Every structure is written in C-alpha cells, then in structure tokens.
C-alpha cells in the first residue's frame, strides 16, 4: 500500500510537470468568482450593505461599494422598469432572466444577477466583475488562447440567438487575464420576436446539446418570475429556428 501511494504521488507530480493536471475548466476561473458559489453570492447581492453609491455610464446605473470583508466587493444596480426606451423594449427583469438561462446552460458568462431594492426602488443587482478588460483595444488573444476564445464566441452567438438579444457589441463584452469571456447588459433581451439576431457560422456541439435539452418546465421554473408566458415560448421557438440553421451548416 505504501509503495502504491508513493507511485500515485509520483504520477501526480509527473502529470503536473507535464501540464496534464486537472481539466482547464477547474484551473481557469479567473475573474469568475461566482462559479460554484451561485447561491451564496446571489444571497449576498440581495442583502449586503451598500456603503457607497455612485452613478456612472450613459444609462446611469448605480455602482455600489459593499461593506469590506464580504464575498463581493462591488455590484451594479439598474432600476429599469419594463417599458420602451429610445425605441427598444427594456427591463431590469431581462438582466435576471439572462443570468438564469446562463445557469441552466452552465455557461458561466453572465455574472450573478438578482432582484433587489435600493432606496425604495426595485431593480437588478449584478456582481461587478473585477480585474477585467474591454475588447475595443485588444479584441482577440494570442495563438495559445485562440481556439478556446473562438469556442466562447460561438457559445455567445448561440446564447444571444436563444434569448433574442440584438444589442451585442464590444461595449458589453469583457475578458479577464485568462481570456474568459464575460457578457453584460441584457436589458433588451427576450421579448416575443422569434427571428434570430445573429448568423451562426459555427457552433459548440456540447453547448448545443445543452440548449436542445432545455424543457418548458425548466424554463418556467427559472423564468416565470421575470418573463411572460409568450416570452418563454419565444425562447423555444427561437431554438427551433436555431435547429434549422444548424442543420444547414457544413459538416
């Protein structure tokens, strides 16, 4: 037994030296501090004290600094009531719904978002992701990260089509030092339109399998607090159009 134990330790050391340790998904969380801690971070966002608030950006969301020493340092809060703004249907509830769909698909690109009251108003509180960069100055990684990055972009396109999100731009995409993609600003997502916002030139087959496995019961349980019945049905209708388009892609 002792000899076997020593062999096992030696094997672990050799694999680590060769770079064949645990799967990359367990090594490259980077700025995604919420992965595997969804419920506790969601609850913290609902209840943590906001010790300093500042309004920023063109849409004037509120960035809250939370009491030091907690699970999360900052959050962003938007009180966008359901309605039409500048010609677009928007709602803070869509921010939460996008996170819930992300969770169903274990995509881990949309930061935790929950409903919360702040100064008597109800809105969406979302984890403020630290240590990230925008993509406008540096939109693509080096060769070593390129294949994984392209797979992430393919999943993003599939996700946007599923939730009917037409407003994707470099301005609402972030990445951390590990080139993990993080997606923001989904207040214009969902709705009842079933046209696909973006053309899919490639897909992530594993991610498509997750999308295909979604059921109406799963969507109802996760989204009925945030979306109307016809908006939930539109997700399934868009999935059918995705299926048709995917079948036409070259193999």
Question: Where are each of the predicted segments found?
Answer:
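Bacterial N-terminal signal peptides that target proteins for export
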Residues: 1-9
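C-terminal catalytic region of ATP-dependent kinase domains
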Residues: 67, 90, 176-251
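Conserved ATP-binding subdomain of kinase catalytic cores across diverse folds
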Residues: 43-144, 161, 165
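ATP-dependent phospho-/nucleotidyl transfer catalytic cores
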Residues: 119-162, 200-206, 210-233, 239-240
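Canonical protein kinase catalytic loop motif
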Residues: 169-170
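Bacterial N-terminal signal peptides
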Residues: 8-19
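Boundary at the C-terminal end of the N-terminal hydrophobic targeting segment
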Residues: 20-26
């Amino acid at each position: 037994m002792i000899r076997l134990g020593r062999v096992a330790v030696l094997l672990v050391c050799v694999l680590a030296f060769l770079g064949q340790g645990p799967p990359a998904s367990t090594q490259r969380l980077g700025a995604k501090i919420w992965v595997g801690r969804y419920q506790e971070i969601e609850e913290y966002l609902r209840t943590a004290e906001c010790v300093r608030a500042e309004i920023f950006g063109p849409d004037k969301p509120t960035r809250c600094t939370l009491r030091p020493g907690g699970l999360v340092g900052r959050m962003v809060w938007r009180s966008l009531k359901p309605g039409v703004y500048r010609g677009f249907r928007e709602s803070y509830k869509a921010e939460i719904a996008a996170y819930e769909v992300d969770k169903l698909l274990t995509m881990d690109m949309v930061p935790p978002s929950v409903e919360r009251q702040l100064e008597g108003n109800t809105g969406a509180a979302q984890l403020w992701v630290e240590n990230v960069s925008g993509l406008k100055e540096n939109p693509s990684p080096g060769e070593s990260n390129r294949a994984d990055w392209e797979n992430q972009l393919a999943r993003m396109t599939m996700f946007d089509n599923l939730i009917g999100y037409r407003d994707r731009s470099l301005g609402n995409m972030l990445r951390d030092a590990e080139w993990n993609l993080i997606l923001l600003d989904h207040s214009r997502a969902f709705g009842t339109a079933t046209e696909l916002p973006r053309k899919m030139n490639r897909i992530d087959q594993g991610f498509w399998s997750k999308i295909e496995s979604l059921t109406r019961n799963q969507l109802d349980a996760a989204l009925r607090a945030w979306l109307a019945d016809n908006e939930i049905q539109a997700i399934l209708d868009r999935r059918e159009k995705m299926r048709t388009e995917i079948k036409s892609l070259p193999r």
